Every structure is written in C-alpha cells, then in structure tokens.
Amino acid sequence: MMRKVITVVILLMGIFLSISTMALERTSLAICGDGGGWPPYHFEKERKVIGYDIDVLEAVFSPLGLTITVDLPPWQRCLRETNLGRYDIALSAAYSEERDKDYILTDYYYTLQPSYVYSSITYPEGLPIRTAQDIDGFRVCGLQGYNYTGFGVDDSKVRKNGKTFDQVVKMLEANRCDVFLARYEILAGFKASEGIDHLTNGLKVVSIPGISGDKFYMLISRSIPDGLELKSIFDQHIKQLRVSGELDRMIEKYIE
C-alpha cells in the first residue's frame, strides 16, 4: 500500500514538474489585446500597456521566468494573428462557439455586466425594453469584431461599424442607431483610467434585463505546440488567485 502511495506521489510530482519545465522551455509569451482600448483590463498609458489583464498575466507566468510582451493592434487582427500563431494569447474575449472551436479558451478570469446605452435627448422617457429580446426591435450599434451573444440579443442584427467607443457614441448622437451595446465596467474604466467620459450629452447606460454577468476568457492559439500546457498553468493559477481574493484586489486598483 505504501509503495502505491509513493508511486502516485511521484507521478503527480512528475506531472507538475513537466508542466513547469514546459513553461521554462519557452522564454517569452507574445500577447495581443484590443487596440481600441479595453480599460481597465488593458490600455496604453505613457506608451506602456497596463491594466488588470497584464497584472494577471504577470502573476501567473512571470514566476515561471517568462517575459511577457503585449501589443494592441485592431481587435480583428489580434484574433486573426492569434489564430495563426503569431500571437500566443489574445486577451479579454467573450465566449462564442466559433471562438471555442478556433482557440483554446482558458478558465474565465472576470465577469462584466452587459448593458445598453441610449440618448435621453432622443428618448427622454427611456426605451420600452423589458427583456433582452426587446432590444432586437431597435437599431443597435456595436464594435467591429465583437461578439454580443452574451448580451441576449441577436448578434447578426448588431451593426458593427464602429472601431472605437468614440465612433459608436458619435453614431448614437447622430441618430444612426437607437442604442449601442457595452459593458458598464469598460465605460467606467475609460473614465477612471484615462479620464474619458463616454456618458455625456444625455447618454444613459442601463443594465440589460434578465442578463447576468458575462464571463471573459483568454484565447490561446491552437497553432502553438504548448497551448494546452499554457491553459493548464493558467487555469490552476487563476483558481488560486480567485479563491485567495487576489483577483478582486487586482481590479480594485483600477475601479474604486
């Protein structure tokens, strides 16, 4: 019996060491995020990419001796080049069946509240939206390359013409759409991290009725040989950071 226990312990140690050794065999990770900005999760400040995402990456991978580089190209290019293996990981992605097929999804590491934004100048009484499905009856704007399935709406009906929040705000103010979709925490993040307030000139944000927080993941390329090992390392560490409360402390730095 003792011999069996020792054998099991040795096997478990071997698995752990093999994962750690794998991580140490590569010296760096190439990461990409949304060039349009996704504060407080990742954004550029004083020519440096910072934010919650980067803090999480460093907490997970820096102890393994990996150097982390983060670029912020347009989001669609980030996704495309991660798919091709030019980047190892894409940051802050909502779930979709297509992404689950094209990438290796990590465990989720934060949630956001899906909301819609409307103009109280155009609609002083607000909009008659009681369910997420009611939104489909309006002209809805969103950002290019984004997935709005988690908002409870028909993603195919969202006009994804804007490359940045500034552009979708202007589309709303020009009455080219009735609402635009966003996560409240991101809008708050722009104000807290960069001093940019997207909710001026009568714009109001409302949580979408009946929709709970949307989970966000990192997307690991299926074109790299150690993708599953990176996922295993990330998932193990993120669970520990969540249980210890460290994830909450990380985000509190950016949104108070």
Predicted regions and their residues:
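Ligand-binding clefts/hinges and TM-proximal coupling segments of bilobed small-molecule sensing domains
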Residues: 67, 145-160, 198-201, 233-256
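Short helices/loops that flank or line small-molecule/ion binding pockets
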Residues: 76-88, 104, 166-194
